[in-house]
Amino acid sequence: MTTDVRVLRQDDWNLWYDTLIRAFGGVAEASEERELWQTLTECDRSIGVWDGDACVGTAGAFSFRVTVPGGASVPAAGITMVSVAATHRRRGVLTAMMRRQLDDIRSWGEPLAVLTASEPAIYGRFGYGIGTHQLTADVDTSRVRLSVPPGTDDVRLRYAVPADVLDVCEAVYARLVPGRPGMPARRPGWDRLMVLDPESRRDGASPLQCVVAERDGETVGYTRFRVKPDWEPSGPKGTVVLQDLEALDPAAHAALWRFLFDIDLTSHLNARNRPLDEAWLHLVSDIRRCNLRKRDSLHVRLVDVGAALEARTYQAPVDVVFEVEDAFCPWNEGRWRLTGDGKGATCVRTRDSVDLALSVRDLGAAYLGGVSLVSLGAAGRVRELRPGALTEATSAFSSAIAPWLPHGF
């Protein structure tokens, strides 16, 4: 098979995107959804694989900046729209695209690549590690109550048309981004994704609704959600389907969650993609009836090990030599000495004795502070060659706030 990997031309976008849609089952998107993704696609950072006139592979890379421990916003390639035509599976198309992408990202000077995976087993061989997780909750709100903090009743809630309050909601989101690793700063246009509301997204629920939280005339939080009505002989059994919720303080946070718990004619709340450490978990009367499930979210790839490790800060002083294995990006292979603390870090090549040996995949998993190096060591994925080095590095890499990706891309 002879194929050609090339940068996407704007004139080829429709064919390229049709290839992607077919690979994901072939169900056409609403026109407004397709138009938005066309606007967001960065063609000069996207590639297609062509077999003659047929597009048989797709991959893109958004220009993101992602928060890392310490609060810095670090350039990261947001890998997206990856697909291979079913007619060309197991012929090296995906590997060719991953090769081209990582070479390009390195040339752009971006130390990180991140993605969400339709199938998590795919990307480990290319050096991606699972760096964040998310919670889904199915709460029986007829049986669970919230104990709210002082000041909750001082928060005013009001309904608003989602598109009409987009700017104030985005301002709340932007204030939160530096405080949580894994959160991307949303570039212009990405806010529209948050209020996209085609019928195909509703699954029998209402159009998207929005409630904003205010105090003294200032917006301090918001939630966007749908309501899915249902009735049984015993009465209403509707479900609130939460899309997103952000708040600037405990009272606003509690006020919004209490509102969602108490919506008339509903008895369940489905909350998807929430952080592992979210405060509402400590407000509920019965955690078991929240039916929590955890799953992978953001996969992290260190494209430039030295630059990536220097970009974040560390919870405790650290001075450790890593032996990094990276067969797919051999420029990362070898020994790196990381010296850092809460103020900054340096990471340079060294010939000193190795303290810890691990793959770039596992270094990526630990990078945002949500995966413990000790736990990876217990799984045999990190080898400790200097006694005490694993505990030292684990303390340094940890994050007081769980890393989280609030939305897909």
From Swiss-Prot:
One of its GO terms (biological process) is aminoglycoside antibiotic catabolic process. SUPFAM superfamilies: Acyl-CoA N-acyltransferases (Nat), SCP-like. Gene3D superfamilies: 3.40.630.30, SCP2 sterol-binding domain (3.30.1050.10). Residues 3-162 form the N-acetyltransferase domain. It comes from the Bacteria. InterPro entries: Acetyltransf_17 (IPR041380), Acetyltransferase_Eis (IPR051554), Acyl_CoA_acyltransferase (IPR016181), Eis_dom (IPR025559), GNAT_dom (IPR000182), NAcTrfase_Eis (IPR022902), SCP2_sterol-bd_dom_sf (IPR036527). GO terms for molecular function: aminoglycoside N-acetyltransferase activity. Keywords: Acyltransferase, Transferase. Its EC number is 2.3.1.-. Acetyl-CoA binds at residues 82-84, 90-95, 118-119. Pfam families: Acetyltransf_17, Acetyltransf_9, SCP2_2. Belongs to the acetyltransferase Eis family. HAMAP family: Eis. PANTHER family: N-ACETYLTRANSFERASE EIS. Homohexamer; trimer of dimers. This is Uncharacterized N-acetyltransferase SAV_5428. It comes from Streptomyces avermitilis (strain ATCC 31267 / DSM 46492 / JCM 5070 / NBRC 14893 / NCIMB 12804 / NRRL 8165 / MA-4680). The lineage of its organism: Bacteria, Bacillati, Actinomycetota, Actinomycetes, Kitasatosporales.
